Structure formats: structure tokens, C-alpha cells
Design a protein with these regions (language model features):
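Residue-level recognition of well-ordered secondary-structure positions
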Residues: 24-28, 82, 180
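Generic secondary-structure boundary/loop-capping signal
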Residues: 1, 5-8, 35, 43-44, ...
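Alpha-helical scaffold segments that mediate packing/assembly in large oligomeric complexes
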Residues: 2-77
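Sequence/fold signature of self-assembling virion shell proteins
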Residues: 103-206
């Protein structure tokens, strides 16, 4: 629930619209939470919905080129890896130790590390255990390729952004206006080989 005192919007609305700025910050926080849920939610999160046949463990602990090759070999058209930034750093160290050099590629205008031409995208929502281990995801995406897809309602009342709406709740006797900001999201793995997980990736203690 976003609460904004009317005095704030009356007195401090220049040079920036205070309601719009507060709403922007609220939406950003919701999107961060949404990303966390898509990875970690026990019902629909990707970490909990990988088929056991497509869950691998590292050969020696740290994420090696051979480990990522194993992940790639389990599915066609892998679109990207998803890894914690510290796991990406650990993979870079292993590449150096094995005297191999990963590629780079451009995703949304930013240059990122890649392996066999597949981007390795950073995601700090992937958990790190107390023992200093994490997981790396590999996935094929899109309905046409029977991959991992995101789900959201097609239309929402008072829609502000796709899958997100803002509903006016009223004004209190203290002149505080309330808005209910809600995000609706889920994910689905259309066929088991669309998602693979490399577990027990050692990156050192957090």
C-alpha cells in the first residue's frame, strides 16, 4: 500500500511530481520482489520446478567449463544461463585455471560473459548457502520453443504496467491518500528439458 500525505503533493510537486516518484519507487521495489519470487517461490519459482533429471551437481565444486557444457548438453536452444554475480566470478577463475577463455556477447546493449555463445546473465536473487554454494540455471525460453514462460493476466482493472495495477483506496481523516499497488506474476516450465539447474556451485563463504 502506497500512502502519500496530501500536503506533500500540494507543496512539493515541483520540479517532480511527488506521487509519480513515490509510485515509481514502489513499483521498482515490487519488481525486485517479483524477480525474487520467480526464482525462489516454493510453488512456481524456477529453483523449485526443475525436473530431477535436469538437476546436476558440479564435478569438483567450483563452476568449471565442463559443468556448463554438461548443462548445455541437456537441452536444445539454451537461451541463457542465470547465475549469481559471485558464481560468474568463480566461473571466470575456473576458466583461467583451465586456460580457456569465455566469450562475450551483447544483451540489451550491455556486454556480458558468455559460454559457447550463450549469455551468462547475473541475478543476485539466486541464494547463497551458509556453506558458500549456489546454483546456476540454464533455460530455453518462449512458448514457440516449448520453453520457460512468464505468466500474467492479459488485462487488469486500473492497469499501470503489464501485470501491475494501482487502485485508489481513499483519503483518511489525516489527509493521507492510499493506493493499493499489486503485481501479478508466475512462471511455467512447458517441458522438463526447458530448465536445467547446476547445484552445489562453490563460490566461497558469503
Amino acid at each position: 500500500v502506497l500512502r502519500v500525505h496530501n500536503r506533500v503533493t500540494d507543496l512539493y510537486n515541483q520540479p517532480m511530481n511527488q506521487l509519480e516518484q513515490q509510485l515509481r519507487l514502489t513499483v521498482e521495489a515490487l519488481r525486485e520482489r517479483q524477480e525474487h519470487e520467480l526464482i525462489n517461490n516454493t510453488e512456481f519459482g524456477l529453483l523449485h520446478n526443475a525436473d530431477l533429471k535436469h538437476r546436476l551437481t558440479t564435478r569438483t565444486g567450483p563452476p568449471s567449463p565442463l559443468d556448463l557444457d554438461d548443462l548445455l548438453s541437456r537441452r536444445r536452444k539454451t537461451r541463457f544461463f542465470l547465475a549469481h554475480p559471485r558464481a560468474i566470478a568463480a566461473f571466470g577463475r575456473e576458466c583461467t585455471a583451465h586456460r580457456v577463455y569465455p566469450d562475450t556477447t551483447v544483451v540489451d546493449g550491455k556486454r556480458v560473459l558468455a559460454w559457447r555463445g550463450v549469455p551468462i546473465l547475473p541475478c543476485d536473487k539466486l541464494p547463497i548457502s551458509p556453506a558458500g554454494t549456489t546454483s546456476i540455471l540454464a533455460m530455453r525460453t518462449g512458448e514457440d520453443d516449448s520453453g520457460v514462460i512468464g505468466l500474467r493476466p492479459k488485462d487488469l482493472p486500473d492497469e499501470y504496467q503489464p501485470g501491475l495495477n494501482v487502485r485508489f483506496m481513499g483519503v483518511s481523516d489525516r489527509a493521507v491518500t492510499s493506493y493499493l499497488v499489486s503485481a501479478y506474476h508466475s512462471a511455467a516450465v512447458l517441458v522438463p528439458d526447458a530448465l536445467g539447474v547446476l547445484d552445489d556451485v562453490e563460490i566461497g563463504r558469503p
